[in-house]
């Protein structure tokens, strides 16, 4: 049983708490305005050494959905932009995908919409000597979000209030409850065995 609120459209203009650095940040800067123009929100950009070089862009509609057709539409739009600006500087593969069921949590609204579900959170600065937490997230209040630790050892805190500005990385943990809720909301990825619909393009 979760305390997650019923699904509702997110604020399309809500800024991300967690953003990229380096080349990935430059890619995000190039593609985000066009994504917003198409009615999508940027979730995350990653540049990896997979297949030589792969640029992975996660996006979604404000309601959390992202179809294979949406991925293809985004790819057609942003591919020419990246070719012109050339932030990578070498050949690369472009992959557009949905966030997946065990999605990254990059906005305050993400934590609110998935309150009551299990997540892994890593801080940029230690809190009481630790940076990594795994537990049930609660709806954010003010500048922080609470995480309950069901497996906390006796004599240690059963919950922590994490400052949102100190979160460096966060994502949901794949559970049966999360799968059921994602399907109910219609935000589960489609046509991909690994959980992310993709539209790969070579450059």
Swiss-Prot record:
PANTHER family, sorted: RIBOSOME MATURATION FACTOR RIMP (PTHR33867:SF1)
Residue ranges for the region (Disordered) are: 184-203
Disulphide-bonded residues: none
Please state the protein's primary subcellular location.
cytoplasm
User: Which of UniProt's keywords are assigned here?
Assistant: Cytoplasm, Ribosome biogenesis
SUPFAM superfamilies named in the record: YhbC-like, C-terminal domain, YhbC-like, N-terminal domain
Q: What does this protein do?
A: Required for maturation of 30S ribosomal subunits.
Protein family (similarity comment): Belongs to the RimP family.
**UniProt GO BP:** ribosomal small subunit assembly; translation
Q: Which gene encodes it?
A: rimP
Q: Where in the cell is it found?
A: Cytoplasm
- UniProt protein name: Ribosome maturation factor RimP
Q: Which GO terms describe its cellular component?
A: cytosol
């Amino acid at each position: 049983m979760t305390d997650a609120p019923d699904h509702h459209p997110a604020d399309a203009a809500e800024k991300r708490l967690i953003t990229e650095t380096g080349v990935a940040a430059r890619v995000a800067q190039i593609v985000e305005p066009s994504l917003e123009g198409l009615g999508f929100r940027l979730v995350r950009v990653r540049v990896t050494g997979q297949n030589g070089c792969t640029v992975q862009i996660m996006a979604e509609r404000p309601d959390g959905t992202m179809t294979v057709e949406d991925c293809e539409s985004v790819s057609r739009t942003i591919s020419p932009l990246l070719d012109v600006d050339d932030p990578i500087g070498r050949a690369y593969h472009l992959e557009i995908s949905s966030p997946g069921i065990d999605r990254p949590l990059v906005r305050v609204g993400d934590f609110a919409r998935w309150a009551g579900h299990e997540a892994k959170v890593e801080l940029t600065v230690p809190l009481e000597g630790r940076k990594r937490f795994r537990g049930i997230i609660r709806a954010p209040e003010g500048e922080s979000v609470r995480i309950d630790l069901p497996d906390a050892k006796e004599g240690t805190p059963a919950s922590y209030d994490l400052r949102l500005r100190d979160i460096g990385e966060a994502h949901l943990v794949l559970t049966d409850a999360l799968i059921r809720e994602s399907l109910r909301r219609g935000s589960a990825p489609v046509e991909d065995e690994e959980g992310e619909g993709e539209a790969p393009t070579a450059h």
